[in-house]
Structure formats: structure tokens, C-alpha cells
Amino acid sequence: LREDRRHIHDNDAIAIIQQSSLPINLECSINNDIIDIVCKLKPARATLVPENRNEVTTEGGLDVKGNYEKLQKVIDKLHENEIEVSLFIDPNEEIIELSSQLEVEFIELHTGTFANIYAMLHSNLAQTHHSIKELELSKNELKNRLNKSIKEIQTSSKLAKKLNLKVAAGHGLNYQNVKLISQIPEIEELNIGQSIIARSVFIGLSQAIIDMKELIKND
């Protein structure tokens, strides 16, 4: 739920929370008016995300350091309303330590950088007009960057667990790249939306979910 209501409107959030038998994790900005609405709706969890009016979708993690005092007030208010809190952050050790100090229950690691590198390396993205200019690199360089990105997510997940934070991951995850992230043992939740819905257009939502669940199994 954003200030610009780009993704969902208030009535969408109300309908989902009132009709779902499952606990709802509501992603929202840290704007005071939005937080007031979230406190009235009382989802099981609120995931705090950054909001940039010029972006189509969330492009990076929260600036926890720059918004520390603001986040503390928002988190306290959500906790007062018995709402669990998660912070959507980049895989960075300093940010994870700050998140722990803020006493949130969850962090969600931003996997967008990993997903972009993976797509430029393993798909035809580089040959299209959607190519990511800063990632138009040699295959060897992309492989090195992909390994570095995975390592950052692994290291961040381990630190978070050590600090008693629950770990989720999401952004850009799909049927091609998800296994590399789902194999990280500290990650207990994956937030995946667009790729499942896109696949469901062709095979139905039920089968799209079944296919994803098969991929993320770690037997």
C-alpha cells in the first residue's frame, strides 16, 4: 500500500484481509497516513518498503540508516497494534544489525540485483530493448557478479539468523532463478508474485503454484 496507490488501493487491502483465512503480510510505505491505515486494518505482518514516485516497482531496500528514527516510531506504533514487522532491505551486514536494533521480527532480503544479473546471464534479455545497460558485461564478469550476489545473500541470511531475525527474500524471483535462493537454509519465506501470476495466464493459478512449490522444495 503506497502513497500513490500504484499497486493496490485501500479497498483492495480491506477485502483481502477480511476474506482471507491465511495471515496477511501487507507491504506498505512508512508514510504516516499509510501506517494509520495499516494499524486500522491489522494485518498479521507489515513489511515496510521504500517508495519512490518515479519507479514502476520497488528498486531497492529501505534506507534504514537514514530513516532510523522514523522507522523506530513506525515500528513501535505497529507493535502497539500487535502487528508483526518486517523490513525490506538490501543484503548488507550493517543494515541487518540496524534492523536487529529496531527489534523487528522479520527482514526481507531484496533479491532484485541477483535476479537482474541472472537474467542478463541466462536469458535473452541482453538482446532486447529491456537490456540493463549497467549489466551489459562479459559472461565471465556476470558469473562473478552473480556468485558475489548469492554470497551476499547467504552471508546476510546467516547474520540475521544469528541475531534472531526471521529471514524472507523476494523481488524478481521466478521459475528459472528461484532454486539458487531457496537452497539457502536460513531463508524461511519467499515472496513471489509476478512470475506466478504471469504463468497462471497459460496454465491456471493452481498449477502455477504447484510448479513453484516443487521448485522450492529442499528434500
Predicted regions and their residues:
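C-terminal alpha-helical cap/extension of soluble enzyme domains
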Residues: 161, 167-219
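Histidine/lysine/aspartate-rich catalytic loop segments that bind and position anionic ligands
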Residues: 90-150, 156-159
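Active-site beta->alpha loop and helix N-cap motifs at the rims of alpha/beta catalytic domains
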Residues: 29-65
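Catalytic cores of alpha/beta
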Residues: 32-41, 92-103, 169, 173-187
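Glycine-rich, proline-tolerant flexible connector loops at the mouths of alpha/beta enzymes
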Residues: 1-18, 50-63, 111-123, 140-141, ...
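Alpha-helix-loop-beta-strand connector modules within alpha/beta enzyme cores
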Residues: 5-32, 66-86, 131-168, 212-219
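Hydrophobic faces of well-ordered beta-strands that scaffold small-molecule active sites
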Residues: 24-28, 46-48, 85-87, 107-109, ...
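C-terminal helical cap(s) of enzyme catalytic domains, especially alpha/beta-barrels
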Residues: 17, 60, 119-136, 198-219
